[in-house]
Protein backbone atom coordinates (compact mmCIF):
# COMPACT_ATOMS: atom_id res chain seq x y z
CA UNK A 1 0.00 0.00 0.00
CA UNK A 2 1.35 3.41 -0.92
CA UNK A 3 1.42 6.09 1.75
CA UNK A 4 1.58 9.76 1.03
CA UNK A 5 1.49 12.85 3.14
CA UNK A 6 1.84 16.50 2.38
CA UNK A 7 1.81 19.79 4.14
CA UNK A 8 -0.21 22.79 3.00
CA UNK A 9 1.40 26.14 3.65
CA UNK A 10 -1.37 28.68 3.30
CA UNK A 11 -1.01 32.38 3.44
CA UNK A 12 -4.42 33.91 3.66
CA UNK A 13 -3.76 37.13 5.46
CA UNK A 14 -6.66 39.18 6.63
CA UNK A 15 -9.25 36.40 6.44
CA UNK A 16 -11.43 36.70 9.52
CA UNK A 17 -14.40 34.43 8.79
CA UNK A 18 -14.20 30.92 10.24
CA UNK A 19 -14.64 27.98 7.92
CA UNK A 20 -17.84 25.92 8.06
CA UNK A 21 -16.22 22.48 8.41
CA UNK A 22 -19.20 20.47 7.11
CA UNK A 23 -19.28 22.72 4.04
CA UNK A 24 -15.50 22.31 3.64
CA UNK A 25 -15.90 18.53 3.63
CA UNK A 26 -18.68 18.74 1.02
CA UNK A 27 -16.59 21.11 -1.08
CA UNK A 28 -13.65 18.68 -0.97
CA UNK A 29 -15.86 15.92 -2.42
CA UNK A 30 -17.17 18.34 -5.07
CA UNK A 31 -13.66 19.53 -5.94
CA UNK A 32 -12.40 15.96 -6.13
CA UNK A 33 -15.23 14.97 -8.47
CA UNK A 34 -14.68 18.05 -10.63
CA UNK A 35 -11.00 17.08 -10.95
CA UNK A 36 -11.88 13.45 -11.70
CA UNK A 37 -14.32 14.54 -14.43
CA UNK A 38 -11.72 16.88 -15.96
CA UNK A 39 -9.41 13.86 -16.19
CA UNK A 40 -12.08 11.54 -17.63
CA UNK A 41 -12.65 9.57 -14.42
CA UNK A 42 -16.05 8.86 -12.87
CA UNK A 43 -17.30 10.38 -9.62
CA UNK A 44 -16.81 9.10 -6.11
CA UNK A 45 -19.78 9.17 -3.76
CA UNK A 46 -19.75 9.78 -0.02
CA UNK A 47 -19.79 6.58 2.01
CA UNK A 48 -20.82 6.64 5.68
CA UNK A 49 -18.26 4.00 6.72
CA UNK A 50 -15.39 5.82 5.03
CA UNK A 51 -16.68 9.09 6.52
CA UNK A 52 -16.50 7.57 10.01
CA UNK A 53 -13.04 6.20 9.24
CA UNK A 54 -11.83 9.62 8.06
CA UNK A 55 -13.42 11.44 11.02
CA UNK A 56 -11.97 9.14 13.65
CA UNK A 57 -8.47 9.48 12.21
CA UNK A 58 -8.68 13.26 11.64
CA UNK A 59 -9.86 13.67 15.24
CA UNK A 60 -6.92 11.57 16.42
CA UNK A 61 -4.46 13.65 14.39
CA UNK A 62 -5.95 16.90 15.71
CA UNK A 63 -6.02 15.67 19.31
CA UNK A 64 -2.39 14.50 19.25
CA UNK A 65 -0.99 16.96 16.68
CA UNK A 66 0.74 13.96 15.08
CA UNK A 67 0.87 13.62 11.31
CA UNK A 68 1.48 10.27 9.69
CA UNK A 69 -0.67 7.64 7.99
CA UNK A 70 0.22 5.26 10.82
CA UNK A 71 0.10 7.80 13.66
CA UNK A 72 -2.42 5.69 15.59
CA UNK A 73 -0.48 2.47 15.00
CA UNK A 74 -2.88 1.27 12.30
CA UNK A 75 -2.94 1.38 8.51
CA UNK A 76 -5.71 3.08 6.52
CA UNK A 77 -6.92 -0.39 5.50
CA UNK A 78 -7.20 -1.57 9.11
CA UNK A 79 -9.08 1.60 10.10
CA UNK A 80 -11.53 1.20 7.20
CA UNK A 81 -12.17 -2.45 8.03
CA UNK A 82 -12.70 -1.54 11.71
CA UNK A 83 -15.59 0.68 10.58
CA UNK A 84 -17.16 -2.15 8.58
CA UNK A 85 -15.87 -1.18 5.14
CA UNK A 86 -15.16 -4.51 3.40
CA UNK A 87 -12.97 -3.41 0.52
CA UNK A 88 -10.97 -4.60 -2.43
CA UNK A 89 -9.42 -1.12 -2.73
CA UNK A 90 -8.71 1.50 -0.10
CA UNK A 91 -6.45 4.58 -0.20
CA UNK A 92 -5.97 7.60 2.02
CA UNK A 93 -4.84 11.18 1.58
CA UNK A 94 -3.96 13.26 4.63
CA UNK A 95 -2.99 16.89 4.94
CA UNK A 96 -2.58 19.68 7.43
CA UNK A 97 -1.79 23.31 7.21
CA UNK A 98 0.40 25.35 9.51
CA UNK A 99 -1.46 28.65 9.61
CA UNK A 100 -3.97 28.80 12.44
CA UNK A 101 -5.65 32.04 11.35
CA UNK A 102 -9.27 31.95 10.19
CA UNK A 103 -10.14 30.60 6.76
CA UNK A 104 -13.13 30.94 4.53
CA UNK A 105 -14.88 27.70 3.70
CA UNK A 106 -14.08 27.85 0.00
CA UNK A 107 -10.43 28.83 0.54
CA UNK A 108 -9.72 25.95 2.91
CA UNK A 109 -11.38 23.35 0.66
CA UNK A 110 -9.71 24.74 -2.45
CA UNK A 111 -6.24 24.70 -0.88
CA UNK A 112 -6.59 21.15 0.43
CA UNK A 113 -7.80 19.79 -2.93
CA UNK A 114 -5.12 21.71 -4.82
CA UNK A 115 -2.40 20.42 -2.50
CA UNK A 116 -3.47 16.84 -3.14
CA UNK A 117 -3.67 17.47 -6.90
CA UNK A 118 -0.11 18.84 -6.86
CA UNK A 119 1.31 15.82 -5.00
CA UNK A 120 1.94 12.83 -7.32
CA UNK A 121 0.87 10.16 -4.81
CA UNK A 122 -2.23 12.01 -3.69
CA UNK A 123 -3.11 12.80 -7.28
CA UNK A 124 -2.94 9.06 -8.07
CA UNK A 125 -5.35 8.34 -5.23
CA UNK A 126 -7.73 11.08 -6.39
CA UNK A 127 -7.72 9.72 -9.94
CA UNK A 128 -7.91 6.01 -9.09
CA UNK A 129 -10.63 4.91 -11.53
CA UNK A 130 -11.57 1.86 -9.45
CA UNK A 131 -12.39 4.04 -6.43
CA UNK A 132 -16.12 4.78 -6.26
CA UNK A 133 -16.55 5.68 -2.58
CA UNK A 134 -15.05 8.46 -0.49
CA UNK A 135 -15.05 9.71 3.07
CA UNK A 136 -13.78 13.13 4.11
CA UNK A 137 -13.06 14.78 7.43
CA UNK A 138 -11.53 18.11 8.42
CA UNK A 139 -10.83 18.74 12.11
CA UNK A 140 -9.13 21.71 13.74
CA UNK A 141 -6.72 21.05 16.59
CA UNK A 142 -7.63 22.82 19.82
CA UNK A 143 -3.95 22.88 20.76
CA UNK A 144 -2.20 24.15 17.63
CA UNK A 145 -5.09 25.54 15.57
CA UNK A 146 -4.00 23.38 12.62
CA UNK A 147 -6.62 21.92 10.31
CA UNK A 148 -6.14 18.18 9.71
CA UNK A 149 -7.82 16.68 6.65
CA UNK A 150 -8.33 13.02 5.78
CA UNK A 151 -9.81 11.78 2.51
CA UNK A 152 -10.46 8.07 2.07
CA UNK A 153 -11.08 6.39 -1.27
CA UNK A 154 -12.41 2.90 -1.71
CA UNK A 155 -14.31 0.23 -3.53
CA UNK A 156 -16.33 -2.40 -1.71
CA UNK A 157 -15.30 -6.01 -2.16
CA UNK A 158 -18.76 -6.90 -3.52
CA UNK A 159 -18.24 -4.42 -6.38
CA UNK A 160 -14.95 -6.07 -7.39
CA UNK A 161 -16.36 -9.44 -8.29
Q: How should each PLM-predicted stretch be described?
A:
Residues 4-13:
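Sec-dependent N-terminal signal peptides
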Residues 8, 48, 138:
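Residues that line or immediately flank small-molecule/substrate-binding pockets and catalytic motifs
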Residues 14-18:
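Sec/Tat signal peptide C-region and signal peptidase I cleavage site
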Residues 19-83, 129, 133-135:
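Short, well-ordered surface patches within globular domains
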Residues 77-157:
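A well-ordered secondary-structure block
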Residues 160-161:
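Short, solvent-exposed mixed-charge patches
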Amino acid sequence: MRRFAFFVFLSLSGVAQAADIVAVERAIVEGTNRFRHEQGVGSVRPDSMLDRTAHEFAEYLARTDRFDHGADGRTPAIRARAHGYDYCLVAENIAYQFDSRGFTTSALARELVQGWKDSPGHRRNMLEARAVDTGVAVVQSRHSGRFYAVQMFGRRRAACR
